[in-house]
Amino acid sequence: YAHTAFVVIAGLLSLQGCSKPAAAAPATAETALGAEHISAASAVDAGRYLVKIGGCNDCHTPGFAMTNGASPAEGEWLTGDSVGFSGPWGVSYPANLRLSFQNMDEAQFIELSRAGQGRPPMPWPSLKAMSDKDLKAIYAYIKSLGAKGEMAPAALSPGVAPDRPHIPFI
């Protein structure tokens, strides 16, 4: 009898693994925009990491994408670029983030990141999905670099031909 009971219990336990798993709790705005964040020794370190993995340098640092990240040195990061991106929106140029945010406080930076109203190819959905803590870290990192470089060229309206190199999207 003990052997039969053991077999029945073992069988029931093995069937437990075949049952449908419980549904995961749905994500909430708090989870999507508040709880997830990068941890590092400091906000500046977290911001540096997010800038690196987020691809910010690919557009906002001259020569970075062309050298597969080998150059320029970190002291030259995020100074914008005069190589534009063209498409139905016209031509947009990657902003010099080090100058753009010098007169912007942290709250304004977060508001801008959440609004996401700039031209393509800026990945606004990625910024909107970041937690406030991560956006604050990016802001701290950019501010830590200090002002450097020149402002990016002004965006061009659709139909206006650029007088400098650009990457056509369409």
Predicted regions and their residues:
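C-terminal motif of bacterial Sec signal peptides marking the signal peptidase cleavage site
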Residues: 14-17
